[in-house]
Amino acid sequence: MSKNLINFSDLTKKDIFDFIELANNFKSEDSLNYRDENLFPDKKIVSMFCEPSTRTKLSFQIAAHNLGAKFIDFDLSNSSMNKGESLEDTLSAMEMMGVDLCILRHTESVIHDFVKNFSNMQFINAGEGSISHPTQTLIDLMTIHESKEKFENLNITIVGDLDHSRVVNSFIEAIQIVGYKSITFCGHPDLCKNFIESPIGNFEPELDTALQDADVVMTLRIQNERLSEKLTIGASDYVERYQINVDSLQVADPEMILLHPGPVNFGIELSKEASELENCKIRNQIFNGVGMRMAVLTKLFSQA
């Protein structure tokens, strides 16, 4: 295992299951919280988010607190990057100040290019452009594993804006490592151009067909901030054709589980009523975020 977590090429199948096991081990006895483990009181962690974040940043901060590490939230708006300092120079300054690990989110696909230049500071990719978000996928795999024992038996359907989702790219990388039975990609063709002829799954433009026989359904929001062209489908038509709701789920397997990496645009890709169904695991994903990120920090510090 690499000393950094940038994408799933850094991980083996054993690494992934070790993360899941360790994350579960951090749960309290009643499984309603996570234990405080003062494992890394001498470690300094900086979070540097060049894009907005709620769940990812907060769960990393709570994870670091639970592990006893020092957590510094880098204020990008008041930094010298606004004076023209490059990202790499800013990170170099952090390294020289003794930062042990940087949790980095960036709007562009740049993280994997320069981490090799840093020998004394580790990196976690907390979201890189539209190409990767490995810790979110580890959380998703942990959540699936709680309900479905064997990945190799799973029919998985992913619905929504696939072309602009970093989550789906990391998920595809990971699921090829742990195994799967089938993957169906579903959404409006404007948002799924890269998946219409995918070598690892089938594209199905009709939601009813895509949901049949699915063991896991992941729905994704439209990433309006990344769209470069106007969609040829209107909002009301999109909701009618692609929203996951109580009615659309009637064709799905009753044992199916429903995921969403967040943030959710309720009333668009997912109805509020569907999110309250027992087989919707969004709350589990949020809860598992803390434990999985505790596991990631622990494993990476053991590689330092």
Predicted regions, residues:
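Glycine-rich phosphate/diphosphate-binding loop of Rossmann-like nucleotide-binding domains
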Residues: 50-61, 146-220
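Rossmann-like adenosine-cofactor binding region
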Residues: 197-273
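Anion-binding alpha/beta catalytic cores of soluble intermediary-metabolism enzymes, centered on
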Residues: 37, 91-94, 99-174, 260
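Short, conserved loop/helix-junction motifs that constitute active-site signature segments
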Residues: 151, 177-179, 247-255, 277
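Positively charged, low-complexity intrinsically disordered leader regions
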Residues: 1-58, 62
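Active-site cofactor/substrate anionic-group-binding motifs, chiefly glycine-
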Residues: 44-97
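Adenosine-phosphate binding glycine-rich loop
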Residues: 255-256, 261-304
